[in-house]
Amino acid sequence: MTDVDIKIENIVASASIGKDIVLTEVSEALEGVNFNREQFPGLVFKLKDPKTAALIFSSGKLVCTGAKSIDDSKLAIKKTVDLMRTIDTEIPHEFEIKIQNIVASANLESTLNLEAVALELEDTEYEPEQFPGLVYRLSDPKVVLLLFGSGKVVCTGAKTRSDAKLGVERAYDRLSELDLI
């Protein structure tokens, strides 16, 4: 199998603290919070380190986006919950953090004829009038790759870094087998 370098661009993680949150209290107590109930049902809290944004909902669910590593994603959620705990001391200390999506990019170091790829490769969608990339859906690992004529690839839907890397490498190998790269 070919070794392709991937770069994590974004990680989306979520957690549920198992307790309802009074959003107005949080928005008044924390700096860096945007809250407009008419526009969006949750708070948007921007953290500087790690540079992320957390969406906080009244149900106690949090969604963190913008992290470039799984560790930073988890750290951002923990920091956000710790800050919320200064407002509401009954927020539990134990909660599960789940990685929902990893977006990664890679460069196949070769241009691609996307029309030929669409004809030869199964599980693809290519409508250049709608979107310049070819959508390639893999089942193992369960990821979606966006392939561009430049040879750039975006992988989405991965739950682990290794799944993102494996998805890109399997696509590279399949393209090589078909003499498309």
From Swiss-Prot:
Disulfide bonds: none
Keywords, alphabetical: DNA-binding, Repeat, Transcription, Transcription regulation
GO molecular function: DNA binding; DNA-binding transcription factor activity
GO biological process, one term: DNA-templated transcription initiation
Gene3D superfamilies: TATA-Binding Protein
Sequence repeat feature ranges: 8-84, 99-175
Domain of life: Archaea
Pfam families to which the protein is assigned, alphabetical: TBP
Physiological role: General factor that plays a role in the activation of archaeal genes transcribed by RNA polymerase. Binds specifically to the TATA box promoter element which lies close to the position of transcription initiation.
UniProt cross-references to NCBIfam families, sorted A to Z: PRK00394.1-2 (NF001593), PRK00394.2-6 (NF001601)
Family: Belongs to the TBP family.
Identification of the protein by name: TATA-box-binding protein
Gene source species: Methanobrevibacter smithii (strain ATCC 35061 / DSM 861 / OCM 144 / PS)
Lineage: Archaea, Methanobacteriati, Methanobacteriota, Methanomada group, Methanobacteria
